[in-house]
């Protein structure tokens, strides 16, 4: 028989059935409180005026009077047993059981109606074989549990127990479930554990470190058949399986959710080390698995304890083509380019990834210097220095700000091509520059504490932008990795807008008078050359003017303007729960508009006509508002946890 208890708030009323009530927060107090709520000694249960004639002393009656007569079966003002049972069985009765009650509660109430004199403390202590105290804010396993002489199962899930005094556990106990508590070490359970315990459940507690493997040996649990240590912070797989090997009766084991279960060879090493194991992490161990990982435990100490993840980012769809909304560039600029990329955060690694990720972070948040010259560079090339270099560059610019004003002296040949020269304004102070920099950094592009930001390559706009990104993360610090997987990773689609301006290099070393004389001399020389060449010079000048609208080769770039187009969380907890792959399409909603798509269609149709002049141009299908269904902004994300499929693969990839 058993009694189950669901989550309810405790009451301050007097407890029953005993005369004394233990302190709140103990197991026995929770049991007594539940029994009190069953009202086993109150109407319609128990003995009272409603059934007293059935329990009057019978010694003074003659033997003829002991035979019940029809009219004397129920005295006036009393209820029959059937009527009382109907009151507790009917759902509409005010004495009906609560919704979260079970069959055991119903049995006890009916017993209290049929034979209320049996409801005593002695009865309860000998009656219960199973106690379930779930989510009752219990903090202490008290010694009153020893009064339950036949107790075999004790379930204390979802409470606040930090330590368990094993001396207070009944020696008859076979099942002890402590799932979802706050136990930080198994040492407290090993003082005087029940010798006949067959199942121990410690899932979702706070077990931490490699020393916990010392407390899962046959010296403490000689008859253990089932062990649940899932979702703790256990780290040393080799030590754990070495200790578990001593449990000869162990058949069911749960270790998933621990950092040690993230290593690629976890399942193979555990299966090969525990030959008698039947079920691991709720998955039956097959003979084929035993064959594939045979011999792996002999080389377990040679395997590196690290987890490997592969992050793949596919296509971006539904991006708004912002360039069609910008005006045509003028000769003096600015020339605007747009790039798009995806960022995600991942937990820090000790060695390899730190150098690369620092460059990625600087690429995202650091503006290019105001005087940097980019000679025929593609828009995808960006600055790769770390953020700390900004302060040094700003200091150098401030020192050179005294020479920032340069007088113009005539028009040069470069001004004919690129338009009027622009005087570059230096920053006035480093504080102002840093203040501007802070404004340019979107807080959504900064990684959360303990993580590093990674980015795909910067790509120009297209209907479908292929990222073709794949990154392998190898991590040795497994405890922070578990915390990261529980939190998930944030995926962001970023639009980068870069404004480029033509650069005019003024001659600083020549005085004004010398420039003027030189200008007249050059003018005369040009006229002489033009006379010798005849009418060829005007044609050349016309070609130069014709190329006036082309962007110059030497440009300076403004700091990139970043805009977050979409941002969302990718849940990674399934990887911790045993799933090898998380694959999703992040949907950030529709960002395109009918106007922008019409402009994009018109621009693309012009390009097609220019390329295929000789061919018959294809008819452009117009976009009507009624049929307009824009594609939402999406990106394909896949994160895979590497897992070894055989002992040979594990030794080849992870042997030190």
Swiss-Prot record:
Residues 1-13 have a biased composition (Acidic residues). Residues 1-25, 512-554 are annotated as: Disordered. The keyword Phosphoprotein does not apply. InterPro entries: Cilia_flagella_integrity, Leu-rich_rpt, LRR_dom_sf. Residues 258-296 form the LRRCT domain. It comes from the Eukaryota. It holds the Pfam family LRR_8. This is Leucine-rich repeat-containing protein 43.
């Amino acid at each position: 028989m058993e009694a189950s208890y669901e989550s309810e708030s405790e009451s301050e009323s007097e407890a029953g059935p005993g005369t004394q009530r233990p302190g709140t927060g103990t197991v026995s107090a929770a049991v007594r409180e539940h029994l009190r709520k069953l009202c086993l000694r109150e109407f319609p249960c128990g003995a009272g005026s409603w059934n007293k004639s059935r329990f009057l002393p019978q010694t003074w009656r003659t033997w003829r009077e002991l035979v019940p007569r029809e009219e004397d079966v129920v005295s006036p003002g009393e209820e029959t047993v059937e009527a009382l049972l109907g009151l507790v069985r009917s759902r509409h009765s005010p004495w009906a059981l609560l919704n979260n009650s079970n069959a055991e509660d119903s049995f006890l109430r009916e017993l209290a109606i049929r034979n209320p004199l049996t409801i005593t403390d002695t009865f309860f202590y000998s009656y219960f074989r199973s106690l379930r105290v779930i989510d009752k804010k219990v903090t202490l396993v008290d010694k009153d549990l020893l009064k339950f002489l036949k107790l075999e199962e004790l379930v204390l899930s979802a409470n606040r127990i930090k330590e368990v005094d094993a001396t207070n556990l009944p020696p008859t106990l076979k099942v002890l479930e402590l799932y979802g508590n706050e136990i930080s070490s198994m040492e407290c359970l090993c003082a005087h554990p029940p010798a006949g315990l067959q199942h121990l459940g410690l899932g979702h507690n706070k077990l931490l470190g490699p020393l916990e493997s010392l407390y899962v040996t046959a010296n403490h649990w000689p008859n253990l058949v089932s062990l649940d240590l899932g979702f703790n912070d256990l780290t040393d797989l080799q030590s754990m399986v070495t200790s578990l090997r001593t449990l000869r009766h162990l058949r069911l084991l749960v270790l998933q959710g621990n950092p040690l279960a993230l290593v690629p060879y976890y399942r193979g090493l555990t299966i090969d080390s525990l030959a008698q194991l039947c079920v691991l992490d709720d998955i039956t161990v097959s003979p084929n698995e035993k064959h594939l990982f045979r011999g792996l435990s002999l080389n377990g100490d040679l395997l590196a304890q690290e987890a490997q993840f592969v992050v793949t980012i596919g296509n971006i769809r539904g991006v708004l083509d912002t360039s069609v909304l910008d005006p045509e560039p003028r000769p003096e600029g600015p020339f605007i380019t747009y790039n798009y990329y995806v960022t995600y955060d991942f937990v820090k690694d000790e060695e390899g990834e730190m150098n690369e990720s620092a460059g990625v972070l600087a690429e995202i948040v650091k503006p290019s210097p105001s005087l940097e010259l980019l000679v025929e560079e593609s828009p995808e090339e960006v600055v790769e220095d770390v953020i700390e270099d900004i302060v040094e560059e700003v200091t150098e610019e401030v020192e050179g700000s005294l020479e920032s004003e340069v007088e113009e002296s005539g028009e040069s040949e470069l001004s004919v091509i690129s338009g009027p020269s622009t005087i570059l304004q230096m920053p006035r102070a480093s504080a102002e520059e840093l203040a501007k920099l802070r404004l340019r950094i979107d807080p959504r592009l900064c990684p959360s504490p303990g993580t590093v930001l990674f980015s795909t390559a910067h790509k120009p706009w297209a209907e479908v932008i292929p990222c073709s990104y794949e990154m392998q993360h190898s991590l040795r610090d497994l405890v922070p990795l578990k915390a990261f997987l529980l939190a998930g990773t944030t995926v962001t689609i970023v639009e980068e807008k870069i404004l480029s301006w033509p650069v005019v290099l003024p001659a600083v070393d020549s005085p004004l008078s010398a420039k003027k004389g030189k200008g007249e001399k050059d003018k005369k020389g040009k006229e002489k050359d033009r006379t010798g060449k005849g009418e060829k010079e005007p044609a050349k000048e016309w070609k130069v003017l014709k190329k006036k609208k082309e962007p110059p080769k030497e440009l300076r770039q403004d700091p990139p303007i970043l805009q977050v187009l979409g941002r969302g969380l990718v849940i990674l907890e399934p990887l911790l729960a045993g799933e090898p792959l998380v694959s999703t399409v992040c949907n950030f909603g529709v960002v395109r508009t009918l106007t922008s798509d019409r402009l994009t269609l018109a621009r693309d149709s012009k390009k097609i006509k220019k390329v295929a002049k000789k061919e018959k141009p294809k008819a452009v299908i117009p976009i009507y508002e009624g049929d307009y269904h824009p594609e939402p902004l999406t990106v394909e994300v896949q994160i895979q946890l590497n897992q070894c499929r055989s002992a040979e693969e594990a030794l080849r990839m992870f042997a030190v």
